[in-house]
Amino acid sequence: MTASLQLPTDLESSSAQDVLRLCLDSFPGRVALACSFQKEESVLLDMLFALDPAARVFAIDTHHLFPETYELWREVERRYATTIETFAGPTPEQLVATHGERLWESKPDLYLSIAKIAPLNRALGDLDCWITGIRRDQAPTRATAAKIGWDAAHELWKANPLADWSDEDCWRYIRERGLPYNPLHDRGYDSIGDTHSTTPGSGREGRWAGTDRVECGRSLMSIVSGMLTMRAPSANCVIAGRSSSLQSPWWT
């Protein structure tokens, strides 16, 4: 960012639409929704394109997503007449040639770094703010997520407009508007990622089943490394560039 701007301090009482509007107004052309094609993104896509039909959306393609996820991807692009910015990891053939079979089992941290974290870093490269579907009730690691704050891990702003929404809030919004959503949700998948690391389950218990992992690499890096130092905008917080510091802890 080259121009200074000042953010309001009362975002906790703001609606999801108001948070999105603030992001669009504050970071024109340099804010994007990170889309993983789950129910939260079904809600946010509808809200975002209602506010700005030219809004930016990006997705990480690990080449291991479910067929249903890829079909929803195409449906979203048709519905909103948009092209989702794609950031991909190595193809399965490239992974095997370089690291052998089933890297996600033999070296899961390396797989996440290659397939998710590296593409995410590229996606965030020209952004000043990114938007996610993180909700506080999804996992203990997300319980204190701010609606907007400074993401120290990536050195940009991060917005979680649905932070205070529940599962039922999301489904009510989807039903009332007849929005497309990932049909895997109807088959018991609350959280959806790669085919090899996702099983049916409530909350995030179906992700990385059989391990003690609750977050994929890109979320964990942001939530643990970044959001522990995230700040909510203070009354005199003026941002001017990516090195901006904020004054008061976002969890207070």
Q: Positions of the model-derived regions?
A:
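Nucleotide-activated chemistry modules centered on ATP-dependent adenylation/adenylyltransferase
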Residues: 1-252
